[in-house]
C-alpha cells in the first residue's frame, strides 16, 4: 500500500480552516460562492483525515496502556480487545484516504458535451444511437442533471445518425468520461423475418465542457458560414439563413448547429468547438504524462470497442474490466451506476498501483 502524503494532509486541513474563517467573515457574494464550492470539495476529505488522526491517537493510547506494567488486568483486557478493532479502522481509513488524496482531474467537476454517432449497421446503428442517447438522458435525470440537445441528425427509420447534447451539472464529466469509445449491439432487428442476430455499433464521445478561461479562440482563427437550416426530408424549417458552420482554421475542426435562431446556433457551435479544442489539449497532455499507463479504462481511445449490449442474452459486457451484467433491460433504461462505479474504481486502483510503484 502506498504511503499517505502527510504533508499534503496537513496542507488540506490548513486550507480548510482558512476557508471556514473567510466564510465566517462575510465575504462578497461571488467570493462566498467560490469558497463554498471549495469547502464542499474539501469537507469529506478533511473529515476522513480527522477520523484517521483520531484513530491513530486511540491506538497510541491503547498501546501505551498495554506497555505500562502498572495497568490493572481489567484495563489490559479491554485494551487488548479494542486495539485490533482500532487497527482495522485505521487500515480502512487509509484505503479511503488514498483514493480521496489521488491527483484530481481538473475537468472532473465540469459539465459535459455528449456526442453519439451511428457506426456500422445502417438503420439499426442509428436506432442503437438513439437507445444510447435515451440511456444517458435517463441516467442524467436520476442525478438531477439537465440535458439539452445542441444538434441532431435523425436516422431514416428512427434514432440518430448523430446527436450532440450538453449535460449540465456538477461532476458530470467525472461520471461519464469513461463512456467514450465504440459501443456494440447484438440483437434481432424488428424487420428481420428470419430472426437472425445483427451486429451494429455507435461511437460515443464525452468531452468536458470548456469555459472561456480554458480555451482561447482568436477571431482570426475561425470562419463562420451561414446556410439554410433544413429539417426531415430536406424541408426548410424557416425562410432565413439560420444554420451555422464554424471552421477552426488551425486544426480544421468543423462544427455545425441548425436551430431556428442564428444567434443561438453560433453560441452552441462555439460551445462545442471550445470543448473539442479543450479535449484535444487534454488528450495531448494525458498521452505525454502517461505514455506507459497500464489502465485500459483511462486510455480514452475512441476507436476502441469498450462495451457490448447483447439483447438475446440480456447481458451487457464492458470489455475493459471484464464486467458482465445480466440486466440489459435495466441498463438500457439508464441504470448504469454499477458500470460507471466499477470503471471509476478500476481507474483509481490503477492510479494507486502506479503511486505504490513510484514510492518503491
Curated annotation (Swiss-Prot):
The modification N5-methylglutamine is found at residue 235. Peptide chain release factor 1 directs the termination of translation in response to the peptide chain termination codons UAG and UAA. Belongs to the prokaryotic/mitochondrial release factor family. It holds the Pfam family RF-1. One of its GO terms (molecular function) is translation release factor activity, codon specific. HAMAP family: Rel_fac_1 (MF_00093). Signal peptide: none annotated. It is found in: Cytoplasm. The keyword Cytoplasm applies. Methylated by PrmC. Methylation increases the termination efficiency of RF1. Gene3D superfamilies: 3.30.160.20, 3.30.70.1660, 6.10.140.1950. The keyword Protein biosynthesis applies. Residues 284-304 are annotated as: Disordered. This is Peptide chain release factor 1. It comes from the Bacteria. Keywords: Cytoplasm, Methylation, Protein biosynthesis. InterPro entries: PCRF, Pep_chain_release_fac_I, Pep_chain_release_fac_I_sf, Prokaryotic/Mito_RF, RF-1. It comes from Agrobacterium fabrum (strain C58 / ATCC 33970) (Agrobacterium tumefaciens (strain C58)). One of its GO terms (cellular component) is cytoplasm.
Amino acid at each position: 500500500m502506498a504511503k499517505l502524503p502527510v504533508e499534503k494532509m496537513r496542507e488540506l486541513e490548513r486550507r480548510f480552516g482558512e476557508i471556514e474563517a473567510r466564510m465566517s467573515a462575510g465575504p462578497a457574494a461571488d467570493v462566498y460562492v467560490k469558497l463554498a464550492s471549495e469547502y464542499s470539495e474539501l469537507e469529506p476529505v478533511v473529515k476522513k483525515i480527522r477520523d484517521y488522526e483520531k484513530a491513530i491517537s486511540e491506538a497510541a493510547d491503547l498501546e501505551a496502556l498495554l506497555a505500562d506494567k502498572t495497568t490493572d488486568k481489567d484495563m489490559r483486557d479491554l485494551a487488548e480487545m479494542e486495539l485490533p478493532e482500532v487497527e482495522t479502522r485505521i487500515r480502512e481509513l487509509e484505503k479511503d484516504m488514498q483514493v480521496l488524496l489521488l491527483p484530481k482531474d481538473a475537468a472532473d467537476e465540469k459539465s459535459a458535451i455528449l456526442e453519439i454517432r451511428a457506426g456500422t449497421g445502417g438503420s439499426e446503428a442509428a436506432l442503437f444511437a438513439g437507445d444510447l442517447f435515451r440511456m444517458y438522458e435517463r441516467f442524467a435525470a436520476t442525478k438531477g442533471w439537465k440535458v439539452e440537445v445542441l444538434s441532431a441528425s435523425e436516422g431514416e427509420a428512427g434514432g440518430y445518425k448523430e446527436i450532440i447534447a450538453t449535460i449540465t451539472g456538477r461532476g458530470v464529466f467525472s461520471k461519464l468520461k469513461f463512456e467514450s469509445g465504440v459501443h456494440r449491439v447484438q440483437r434481432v432487428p424488428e424487420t428481420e423475418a428470419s430472426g437472425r442476430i445483427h451486429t451494429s455499433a455507435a461511437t460515443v464521445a464525452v468531452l468536458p465542457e470548456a469555459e472561456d478561461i480554458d480555451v482561447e479562440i482568436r477571431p482570426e482563427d475561425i470562419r463562420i458560414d451561414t446556410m439554410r437550416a433544413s429539417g426531415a426530408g430536406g424541408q426548410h424549417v424557416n425562410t432565413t439563413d439560420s444554420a451555422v458552420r464554424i471552421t477552426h482554421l488551425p486544426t480544421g475542426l468543423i462544427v455545425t448547429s441548425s436551430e431556428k435562431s442564428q444567434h443561438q446556433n453560433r453560441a452552441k457551435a462555439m460551445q462545442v468547438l471550445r470543448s473539442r479544442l479543450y479535449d484535444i489539449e487534454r488528450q495531448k497532455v494525458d498521452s505525454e504524462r502517461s505514455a506507459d499507463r497500464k489502465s485500459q479504462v483511462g486510455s480514452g481511445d475512441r476507436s476502441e470497442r469498450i462495451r457490448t449490449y447483447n439483447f438475446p442474452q440480456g447481458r451487457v459486457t464492458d470489455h475493459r474490466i471484464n464486467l458482465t451484467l445480466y440486466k440489459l433491460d435495466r441498463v438500457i433504461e439508464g441504470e448504469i451506476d454499477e458500470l460507471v462505479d466499477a470503471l471509476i474504481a478500476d481507474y483509481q486502483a490503477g492510479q494507486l498501483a502506479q503511486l505504490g510503484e513510484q514510492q518503491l
